[in-house]
Amino acid sequence: MNRKILIAALAGAGVAIAGAVLYFTDTIERQPGALAVFTPKAAKTVPFWPARVTTLAGDGIPGALDGPAASSRFDDPFGVALDSKGHIYIADAGDTNRIRTIAPDGTVATFAGSSEGFKDGVGTAAAFNTPSSIAFDHEGNLYVADTGNHAIRKIAKDGTVTTLAGDGSRGDNDGVGRAARFNGPVGLAVDDTGVVWVADTYNDRIRRIGRDGTVTTVAGGRRPGNADGIGAAAGFDTPSAIAVATDGTLYVADTGNNAIRRIAGDGTVTTVAMPQEGERRPVLRRPAGLALTRDGYLYIAASSGGRILQLTPEGEYRALQDADVPPDADGFGPDGTVQLYGPRGIAVERDGGLVVADANAHRLHRLSRPRAGEAPPARPQPVAVRREAPMPWPVGPQDTVHEVVGVMGEVRGSYNGDSRDHFHAGLDVRADVGARVLAVFPSKVSDPYANWGFDSLSEGLSLGPLSYIHMRVGRDSRGKPLDPRFQLLLVEEGKARGRPERVRVPRGTRFAVGDPLGTINAMAHVHLDYYQGGAVVNPLTLPFVGFTDTVAPRINSIALFDSSGTRLRPPQGTRKQPVLDKRLRVPRALGEVNIVVDAYDQVDGNLARRRLGLYKLGYQLLRADGTVVPGYERPLITQVYDRLPRNPDAVKAVYAPSSGITVYGSKSTRFAYAADSRLRDGEAKTGSWNVAALAPGEYILRIHAADFAGQVALEGRDLALVIE
């Protein structure tokens, strides 16, 4: 995945400090410009090194639990910083709102903060609201971008928390200390003179806080934009991270523009990295974390897609390769790169390794070069937390059953003619156009860029463990904001003046159960994606009030195809010479064949025309008398739609080409499953059925097609065969 950046390079960056990469020490004389960066001079950065991923802390369940690393819990780990003694500092937001530490022995503890609020004090007497980026100065003070409080906080080495700038209210004023205002600042870095640089995220500006507390604006205009230029002529869109080199050069993760920007000492903004035009699935998507090495390499946390990118001083970027996960030969599995779930803050260790906060997985990871003879660590799996209490529905009335019109794992196409473009990743609940979409969990926005697709059919919002899609986010059917939590941007010029052109839902925004999130758009349903530990899991595991399923799946047909894709058909007779034995004859000489099952499901309350996907699929081989063939005592379950592969192309491994739905141009909705291909535990693999291994004779191929409720299709499940 080479990416040549033709716009600019990072040459001459010099020794660099990022918002989460600064080490400090008591042994170095503190003078202006005397920075203690403890990367050994001999340890030069290796371009595009293979990374081994190990888990440092967090058991994958959201919470706030101190103690041993393996049993500790984090809610929304974001910013990361390291000190000279090997301690890792983490800004843990969500419901935790604390600054936490991991000691060299792995013990997790709370350094500052307790309940959500805005309060100075010592240690746990202080209060934060959604802390994000953190960074040390060379005196050992830790600075915090306190996003929900629209403020920058300072923590002394003894744990005393004070407010450096901002008064807790949203605004864009320059000024001194509390006279200045910010709008949800997420990114922060400190240079070697003690100046604090802030990515003022929802003001779309870069701000500077001098040593005397004076706040000034360095770059960015009044509104989101995408433009190079000087000062206010430059445009950013939701900048969420910032890093600074010792020569004063700034690097900005311009999240909404999928770009990395550079700000020179004179305020000139240039773009140094962004996806190439037309790139199908770019790796540089929604950058949310940055870290600079002393020799000018920039690490980027791409929060959408989960990659960790390295940008060289020459301007080339790639995703770091995973030392223990090679690329899948079929092209349907891993691509060989490190892929976390929701990487945010990054810090560079002394040996050049990385510490990364994975907010969506509720874990902290280390990326390091593998050592000779060292066995790869076990990869932690997403933790499933079963919910027992009845769940409200995402549309009103929330305590009344609504029709489910789509389930996870169904095939979906694209509008450019591909009938198998991606998996349907969630649950669809029918509702009238204009109906309000309502929150089903008490949740807080984590992602700095939480909503997308303004005025498109796919418009949606990521909130807590769910994404709500196919709605006008934060607006009623007339485009009016539902409440002040939604920041509506209006057109300022021309005939469309006064009309909404965008809505923002900032990081740290809270919603209670039943709060309106938007209104149903022309898709006439709300789509729910459900995440646990970062992985997309089946929303049918949520116990929605009154939901029942007593309808068994149905099988339309079972077909076999040879390796060339030609369907095997039973013998065809004529009127004069009818064929009495219409069993399908399968020559052993074919070797490998493919089993394709056309099947669908329904649930209680579905219209007769509704077609839903299966939850579980497999097959069993019987003799003609109904006795089982050895090795097939139980059905061989090949596909379980509890989790989905992260590679969207995996849909082509488990669905035959004849699959498709009418929304994307197919004549009818058809789920034609490649039943011998595997999908288990979120991993897909193409497969086949080896008929050459069978003895000649008469058999019955029995399909096991089940729904989430455990009901199995009975009619049409058997295909009589003669292996010859």
What does each model-found stretch correspond to?
Residues 97-100, 107, 150-154, 160, ...:
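A short loop-to-beta-strand structural motif that recurs across blades of beta-propeller domains
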Residues 42-76, 107-132, 160-184, 214-240, ...:
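Gly/Pro-rich loop segments of beta-rich domains
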Residues 87-89, 141-143, 195-197, 249-251, ...:
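Conserved beta-propeller blade signature
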Residues 82-85, 136-139, 190-193, 244-247, ...:
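Residue-level detector of Asp-centered blade-edge/turn motifs that repeat once per structural unit
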